[in-house]
Amino acid sequence: MVSIWRTLKSAHRCIRFLSLGKLVPNSPQCPSLMPSRFLPPPHRQPRWWALLVIGLWLGFTVATLTRLPTWGLVPVAGGWLLLARRWRWGAPPQPHPVRRVWPWSLLPIALWGLYVYLADSFGMVDLGAVFFHLQAGMEEHGGGERIGAAILYTLSMLLLLVSFTWLVRVDHRWRLAERLLALALLAGNPMLYGIGQRGAAIVTEDGAWLERQYVEPVILEAPRDPPNLLLLYLESLERTYADRERFGDAYAHLEALGEKAVVFEGVRQVDNTGWTMAGMIASQCGTPLMPAGLLHDSQFEPLGKVVPGVDCLGDLLDARGYSLTYMGGASTRFAGKGVFYRDHGFDRVLGREELEPGLEAPDYVNSWGLYDDTLYDLTVEEMRRLERQDGPWGLVNLSITGHAPNGYPARDCRERQGEFDGVDILYSVECSAWLARRLVERLEEEGLLENTLVVVASDHLTMRVSAWEQLVAGERDNTFMLLGEQLQPRRLEVEASTMDLLPTVLEAMGFVIDWHRAGLGVSLLSAEPTLVEEHGLDTLNARLREETALQERLWEGLEPPQGPPPPPEPVVEQVVETPKDQALEAPEELP
């Protein structure tokens, strides 16, 4: 109160002198009229603003890369500011002239900012996913809600770079140390470490360990009356949600469905299988999705083919006369989804572009596409159409309800569950599980599941969501269950990965395959050990980072031409004689 009174008294004195014409506004004799005098002392100079920005970014980085809650950034930022005050960062005891230099650390800091953004958005940073989406194409993506977050991240990163540049220019101690800091930031960036590890493996390893484990999928024998196949991918609906202590009843409807199914517990996620396209390829082709990289024939165009070098579930069933359909509410142009299914035996590939024009309520869509209650209604119609045809059929369906970060709960769920707060992923998990159970029960009532194997699986483990801390607190595994007339309901504890789904599904359909294997997968209905069981998840991931031969197999046919192009073959003119030509020729004289 005393300081405020003194400020007001000083201001009154200055105003009186000004009115008499004895002082000039904002002169040193009248400093009380300067705007900075009315601000708290830390706010009168850019020093503390710059240090605060750096501290908040440090705190956010620590909170994002550890299991600290978001508010954990506050003590980290506070500790940074205390150190800054103790060591007078930005205001050295022995000032040096300000030098207009550009810090060496700007690029390393920006790369760390990119890594933190990816970690905050997706939970686990998968460089394979980044490279694949860049090559496969990202048009018609539904992540519009992430654009705003990306803009905020970019602006805050620019503010951080400006703040750090200011600190280096005004404090000579930071100028001396920041080159070492740049090296430390580069060496410690996990994203760059992964790239460097991959490059070193290409040079030092033979890169063919997984290739030697690969078994080409082959059907040796087929049942007399092969069953139909309904494969339901539930977006990000991992089996981890079945833990009632952590997640309540969010997974309860799938648990109820599992009472009449073969339920597999312990289906883990290996590297390069942790996003939708990678999860579908792992479960249908028995391989991880290793990006094409330099094997892509045109680096500036989207992929024209997706894993053309291996046979997948669709190829095997198509060769056996199956009519195959893919259905999903999102665009099939995103991440090469449509290309993959069309190239691997599917007759009909139906996504947002094909399904949305026929909707009765065209406004009832989300940023990705159709809601799942609409998609499942159309799925029933497609199954009726397939049933009217002769021969076996297969239908692959991909949901959207559980998509990170918040999910897209359908209208039917909102009417049943009440208001959605827009954040709680467990609301969306319950919705997805209930919709899947309702679809299966509806198909059973209509008799559309006779002689049909139903597969319910998560495409991959979820990315960062509101329940992230609870999810990463223990072991995580994927959803995988089989429902069929010939299958005895039971629970099987396995050590497996999503690559084991392909041979398991084939054997559940009654097909005989070579050594119970297909791709890198092993049938979980057999006694054969899986790669995860034999070698462990860590070893498998380490081998995957070293692999080059399997990558070449996956993308066989996309290699750019090596060396100079071959010279064109000379054109040989072909002369064709007609009877008329022969008549004009002089007859050969006889001796």
Task: Label each region the model flagged.
Residues 3-6, 10-14, 19:
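Low-acidity, Ser/Thr- and Arg-rich intrinsically disordered low-complexity segments
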Residues 1, 23, 52, 73, ...:
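Detector for intrinsically disordered, low-structure N-terminal pre-sequences
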Residues 198-213:
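Alpha-helical transmembrane signal-anchor/signal-peptide segments
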Residues 90-93, 97, 211-215, 437-440:
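Short, motif-level signal for alpha-helix interfacial/capping segments enriched in acidic residues
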Residues 5, 35-202:
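Transmembrane and membrane-interface helices of multi-pass
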Residues 23-33:
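Short, Lys/Arg-enriched N-terminal segments with co-localized hydrophobic residues
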